[in-house]
Amino acid sequence: LGPRDFRITTRIVEGEPFSSLLATAHEWGHSIYEQGLPAQSHQWFSWPLGQATSMAVHESQSLFWENRIAKSKAFAKSFFGNFADQGCPLDNYQEFWQSINVVKKGLNRVEADELSYGLHIIIRTELEIELIEGNLNPKDLPYEWNKKYQELLGVTPSNDSEGCLQDVHWSEGAFGYFPSYLIGHLISAQISDTLENDVGSINAVSYTHLTLP
């Protein structure tokens, strides 16, 4: 709401703690990026210099924290104790790390692993291009969505809330936004590679004070 408002919202899924953890890490990435913009000096607030370079860069920051940090072995080693204290059925941080990085096909974009995530974006981008160019009637969107999901991911939504209505973007008028996520993934990978070349492996990082209140 203002130049120093960095509050975030997150997703809480009962019985799915990894989902909530990664969602929070993602939104934290957005927040910390905003905190580092020149707009915080107030001098450049609302000016181009004080704004994000692009939404792809913005998403790269959130995806860096979600996929490069929160899914790292070093983070799992440091944070596992919090889950163990809450009755986590996993025996050690190694199992925690493996579980949070499991690869499986699914319907939900925000729950997708890094391997299949790009396919979710490709489906949305292809469909919205067809919509914008007038080649796809909106009433036919659920059918075409389900068809593409079966073709590319081998899964079919049982209802539209699992399918073409699962994202808020189109209902908000945010057409053309989805590629920002995929470009953001690529940028976050480049940041990780540069970081590790300069200062060493992310998995060598020692995290402290990672305890739940």
Predicted feature locations:
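Active-site-proximal, well-structured secondary-structure segments within enzyme catalytic domains
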Residues: 1-11
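Short pre-active-site segment immediately N-terminal to the catalytic Zn-binding motif
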Residues: 10-22
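Active-site recognition of the HExxH zinc-binding catalytic motif
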Residues: 22-35, 62
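Post-HEXXH active-site segment of zinc metalloproteases
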Residues: 34-60
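Post-HExxH zinc-binding segment in Zn-dependent metallohydrolases
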Residues: 51-88
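Long, amphipathic alpha-helical stalk/connector segments used for oligomerization, subunit docking
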Residues: 75-168, 172
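C-terminal substrate/ligand-recognition segments
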Residues: 173-193
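Conserved small/polar residues in nucleotide/adenosyl-binding loops
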Residues: 208-213
